[in-house]
């Protein structure tokens, strides 16, 4: 039995509340169990210098955790004067995952920045940020279409992500912190709406695992992402 009482193939309770902030072109509060992430999408009619004049847009991401999003307070990275390697890795992952789901040429010469702020962390913050990031991005693009700034929809696919792992020898879906901290193996899967893979991050923490173990995690992730896709569709309908 999992610490949460869930079955091995069961997601945590998932909710997506859109329009959570007033000013951003797209926003949502996404919750997987006790993990809660506020995601906003902000439109800027400018591009990084290396992209100017190339006839395409850009989607980038920033990620951060509130000081008391975890069991004990952590100093803000701004107070430390630099971002951690973990933060940089996660925000790059979010950005490239979301770029896989959009035609940057159809976006035009503008940038959409996805800001992911972890309000409460209980495992799976990066995957929640990606899944919520797509919702915020979709909402921002909808505004561009409604205003006539875009005449063609640049979104080519939904994007969602979920964690899986091997806990006490059993492959499980959507690890919370209690499971993640003791898992023999863990993985993050990012998928397109048709279940094609965008990214896989997998590592053995306690013991190596074989190819069949990885495939079992992949099958769980595909099942979980299908449920997330359904919730995303409801949120942006």
Curated annotation (Swiss-Prot):
Native organism: Zymomonas mobilis subsp. mobilis (strain ATCC 31821 / ZM4 / CP4)
Q: Which PANTHER family match?
A: EXOSOME COMPLEX COMPONENT, EXOSOME COMPLEX COMPONENT RRP41
Question: What is this protein identified as?
Answer: Ribonuclease PH
In terms of Pfam families, this protein maps to: RNase_PH (PF01138), RNase_PH_C (PF03725)
Q: Which UniProt keywords apply?
A: Nucleotidyltransferase, RNA-binding, rRNA processing, Transferase, tRNA processing, tRNA-binding
Kindly list the positions annotated as binding phosphate. Answer: 86, 124-126
* InterPro entries registered for this protein in UniProt: ExoRNase_PH_dom1, ExoRNase_PH_dom2, ExoRNase_PH_dom2_sf, PNPase/RNase_PH_dom_sf, Ribosomal_Su5_D2-typ_SF, RNase_PH, RNase_PH_bac-type, RNase_PH_CS
UniProt GO BP = rRNA catabolic process; rRNA processing; tRNA processing
Recorded GO terms, molecular function? 3'-5'-RNA exonuclease activity; tRNA binding; tRNA nucleotidyltransferase activity
What EC number(s) has UniProt assigned to this enzyme? 2.7.7.56
Is Heme set as a keyword in this record?
no
Q: Which HAMAP family match?
A: RNase_PH
Gene name, per UniProt, is rph
Lineage: superkingdom: Bacteria
Its family remark reads: Belongs to the RNase PH family.
Which transformation does this protein catalyse, written as a reaction? tRNA(n+1) + phosphate = tRNA(n) + a ribonucleoside 5'-diphosphate
Q: Which CDD domains match?
A: RNase_PH_bact
Q: Does the keyword tRNA processing apply?
A: yes
């Amino acid at each position: 039995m999992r610490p949460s009482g869930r079955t091995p193939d069961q997601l945590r309770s998932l909710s997506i509340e859109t329009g959570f902030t007033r000013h951003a072109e797209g926003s949502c509060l996404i919750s997987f169990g006790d993990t809660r992430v506020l995601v906003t999408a902000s439109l800027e009619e400018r591009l990084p210098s290396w992209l100017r004049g190339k006839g395409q847009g850009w989607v980038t991401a920033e990620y951060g955790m509130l000081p008391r999003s975890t069991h004990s307070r952590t100093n803000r990275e701004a107070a430390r004067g630099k971002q951690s390697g973990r933060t940089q890795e996660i925000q790059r992952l979010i950005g490239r995952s979301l770029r896989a789901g959009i035609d940057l040429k159809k976006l035009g010469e503008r940038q959409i920045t996805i800001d992911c702020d972890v309000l409460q962390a209980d495992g799976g913050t990066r995957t929640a940020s990606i899944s919520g990031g797509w919702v915020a991005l979709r909402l921002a693009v909808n505004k561009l279409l409604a205003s006539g700034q875009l005449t063609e929809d640049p979104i080519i696919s939904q994007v969602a992500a979920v964690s899986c792992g091997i806990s006490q020898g059993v492959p499980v879906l959507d690890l919370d912190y209690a499971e993640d901290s003791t898992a023999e193996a863990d993985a993050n899967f990012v998928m397109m709406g048709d279940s094609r893979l965008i990214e896989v991050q997998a590592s053995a923490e306690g013991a190596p695992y074989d190819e069949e173990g990885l495939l079992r995690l992949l099958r769980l992730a595909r099942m979980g992402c299908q449920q997330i896709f359904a919730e995303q569709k409801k949120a942006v309908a």
